[in-house]
Amino acid sequence: MKKRIYNLWLILGLFVLLMLAAGCGDILSAQENTQNELPGAKFVRQIVAKDNTSSRVIMWQSDEPIADGAVEYRQVGDNKVSRVGAKGEIYTDDGQNLMLYTAKMENLPAGVELEYRLIGNGQVGKWHSLSTDDGGAFTALIFPDSQSSDYSGWQELAQNAAKRNPEAKFFVNMGDLVDNGEDHSQWEAWFNSLAGIIDRIPVAPIM
């Protein structure tokens, strides 16, 4: 009798474990295919590194801290994922505190297409494109001052240039990026104007 009860509990235990595993698998699968950014993260951007053939800097910010913030990346078509931790620091912008995260990917293969995503708070974000330089000729987008009244002109200029030059490897923004560097709304307008660009190719800002 005791043996039967033991076997029954064993079967029930295995059943529960299998159900939990299946549930976790569904969650991970849903996260893997998400088309949304990591909750709380905004203004994801690539920054030029010392050597763009083998390294890249990824930055983003959030209004609240993100636990265990990191960047996962992989070569396109390869399921092997690497991870690098992100350093978070408090940054005060126009009297408002926010969290600024920085992750540096190194020892990347040259001349390849990769993709990266943000992780944190037990969640993952969507994949973003990233390509490393091959050391040869390249195309870059070079913009003058982007400061303006409402940044609609800057948005039109940047987006049209990116569409006409999809092969561009990075972009340079010379001079004054915003009219008032102490006005956080202007920085948000500057970043919003670069949606779909700055997360895909790195920026080389010149203040």
What is the predicted role of each segment?
Residues 1-6:
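Positively charged n-region of N-terminal signal peptides that target proteins for export
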Residues 7, 58, 125, 152, ...:
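Short, low-complexity intrinsically disordered segments
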Residues 9, 13, 20-142, 163-164:
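Acidic, histidine-bearing metal-coordination/catalytic regions of metal-dependent phosphoesterases
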Residues 135-207:
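Active-site neighborhood of divalent metal-dependent phosphoester/pyrophosphate hydrolases
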